[in-house]
Amino acid sequence: GSGKSTFATLLSHSHGFVHLEADSHFMTNGKYTFDPLRAADAHAVVVRDAFSAMQAGRKVVVANTHVRLWEMSGIVGATQLAGRTLCFVECAANWGNIHDVPQAALDAMRARWEPLPAEFRAIAFRLTANSDE
């Protein structure tokens, strides 16, 4: 509901980024069904695919929920190995819950949330559903 997938889709369609996210591994026939036993594998596939795309010279956007800072380590490592530049975007909008994640799960993630340290924040901007804003 923070706008991660929406923002990643925009970058993919408008600027040619490869859009990756662990949530895509939990979609079956258009329905999102999270399986915590497959979460680590889904994130590992995203890191692998991001690294491959970066090695091929592609721009990559990863729309994952990294609740704890250490959860970004795979993407950070892949970016460093590929010799690419990394930019973090912290989405804070309310775009609705497109994956129907239970409210209790969202509340638990918010309670564990570690915001990006100030040194990782390059810019702040607002992305809205209305293209006139």
Regions found by a protein language model. Give the residues of each.
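Short alpha-helix boundary/capping motifs
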Residues: 1-2, 69
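Conserved GTP-binding G-domain of TRAFAC-class P-loop NTPases and closely related GTPase folds
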Residues: 2-5, 10, 14-18, 77-133
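Conserved substrate/cofactor phosphate-moiety recognition/catalytic segment
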Residues: 6-56, 92-97
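Glycine-rich phosphate-binding loop used to anchor ATP phosphates in small-molecule kinases
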Residues: 37-90
